[in-house]
C-alpha cells in the first residue's frame, strides 16, 4: 500500500497556538458547558419518563428510539444545507436544546414527549456537527490535535453532566431535571455570539 503522509495534523507543540485562538477556545467552553447541561437531563430521561411523566417502559424505549432517529435526521439536514443555511448556524441548535430542556417537565398530551425528544435529538446532532466543522475551520493547520481536544472535552461534558444530574436527582428529585440543565445552558448563548461573529 502507498504511504499516505499526514497533512496539517499538528503536534503537542500546536497546543499553545490552539489556545490563543479565541473562537476555538470559545467553542471548547461552549461544548463543555452545553454538553454538561444536555447530559444532566438526558442521562436520566428514562426514569424521568417512567416516574415523573408516568409513561410505560415501552413508551420510554420508543422515545429513546425517536431521539436516535431524529439525530440521524439532523445529520441529513446538515449535510443537505448550504453554508449560509439555518442548520449551519450554531446558535440555532443551542437555542433548540435550551428550549427542549425547559419544556421537558411539561406533558400536555400523550405524544408530546415524542415530538420534544425528536426536536431535542435533531438539535444535539446539529450542534455536534456544527462543532466539528468549526474545529476544522478554526484549526486547519492542526486539525488532529484540535479535534482530539474537542472530542475529549465532549466526553468530559458527558461525564460531568451525568455526575451533576445524579447530584440534582439525589438532592432535589427528578421532576425539574430538564430545568436544571436549561439553567446551566443559557449562558452558552454568549459563547455562540462570539463564535458566530468569528465564523
Question: What spans do the regions from the language model cover?
Answer:
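C-terminal transmembrane helical hairpin of 12-TM major facilitator-type secondary transporters
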Residues: 86-131
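C-terminal membrane-cytosol helix-exit motif in multi-pass small-molecule transporters
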Residues: 1-7, 191-195
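Juxtamembrane helix-start elements in MFS-like secondary transporters
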Residues: 55-64, 109, 113, 143-147
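Helix-to-loop junctions at the C-terminal end of transmembrane segments
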Residues: 73-86, 169
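Multi-pass alpha-helical transporter architecture, strongest
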Residues: 182-199
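A late C-terminal transmembrane helix in Major Facilitator Superfamily
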Residues: 137-174, 178-181
Amino acid at each position: 500500500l502507498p504511504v499516505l503522509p499526514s497533512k496539517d495534523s499538528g503536534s503537542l507543540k500546536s497546543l499553545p497556538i490552539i489556545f490563543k485562538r479565541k473562537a476555538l477556545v470559545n467553542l471548547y467552553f461552549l461544548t463543555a458547558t452545553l454538553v454538561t447541561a444536555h447530559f444532566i437531563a438526558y442521562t436520566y430521561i428514562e426514569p424521568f419518563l417512567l416516574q415523573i411523566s408516568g409513561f410505560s417502559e415501552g413508551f420510554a424505549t420508543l422515545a429513546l428510539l425517536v431521539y436516535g432517529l431524529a439525530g440521524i435526521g439532523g445529520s441529513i439536514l446538515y449535510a443537505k444545507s448550504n453554508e449560509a443555511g439555518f442548520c449551519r448556524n450554531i446558535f440555532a441548535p443551542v437555542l433548540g436544546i435550551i428550549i427542549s430542556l425547559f419544556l421537558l417537565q411539561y406533558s400536555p398530551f400523550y405524544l408530546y414527549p415524542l415530538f420534544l425528544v425528536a426536536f431535542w435529538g435533531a438539535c444535539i446532532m446539529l450542534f455536534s456537527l456544527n462543532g466539528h466543522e468549526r474545529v476544522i475551520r478554526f484549526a486547519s493547520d492542526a486539525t488532529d490535535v484540535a479535534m482530539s481536544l474537542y472530542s475529549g472535552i465532549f466526553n468530559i461534558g458527558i461525564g460531568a453532566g451525568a455526575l451533576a444530574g445524579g447530584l440534582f436527582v439525589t438532592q432535589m428529585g427528578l421532576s425539574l431535571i430538564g430545568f436544571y440543565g436549561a439553567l446551566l445552558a443559557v449562558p452558552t448563548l454568549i459563547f455562540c455570539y462570539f463564535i458566530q461573529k468569528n465564523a
